[in-house]
Amino acid sequence: MTPLLDVRGLRGGYGRVEVLRGVDLCVNRGEIVALLGSNGAGKSTLNNAVCGINPAWGGTVHFNGVDLTRAHYRLIVKAGLIQVPEGRKVFPNLTVRENLELGSFTRARERRAQNVERVFVIFPRLRERVAQRAGLMSGGEQQMLAIGRGLMAEPELLILDEPSLGLSPRLVEELFTLIRRLHDDGLAVLLVEQNVGQSLEIADRAYVLENGSVRFSGLPADLLASDGLRRAYLGL
């Protein structure tokens, strides 16, 4: 089976500083794949290279069988590879509806109204605040809005970059329940997280990134079963 996302030998960084050192990673259709690692491991750099925000220095990125290694980020979005960035990045002076509608600017524009309604079904709280400015919402509500905006583009693969960052334990529980629900509906998810325990509970497979290299790839159960791996890379 050809992976939905197939990353091979990816290298990248900033200026003269190499961050990614030959990363191999794949996500199959309908999978949740957890990408774990500490701050500075290279997780966000990998996301940005895959999504075309910071071009890769070397290696390849194939999505749906198409080489997108050097593609413009707009073409990557049109292909259905959508990232919800770390820190939510909502537009604070725009309303909830306006933020959502921007999510379909490049892809699925003709189904904007239907997709707004779909997001409101998933996140009823957003319907209640449809005319509210995003900057006046709580952190949890902004995270709902950021994910909803990503869903507006009808992604084939949704990359969630540190979605639990700054949320209360209760909201983190709600978030991971939502991710599982999206997966049950058939959406492939690349979950980039420092919340190791809950990520491994819902993931089909996991990667551990350290200093820009993959130190582990496999089943969550295998990662948790190895005392050495857990201590060295997860702090468990």
Task: Tell what function each PLM region has.
Residues 2-236:
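Glycine-rich phosphate-binding loops of nucleotide-dependent enzymes
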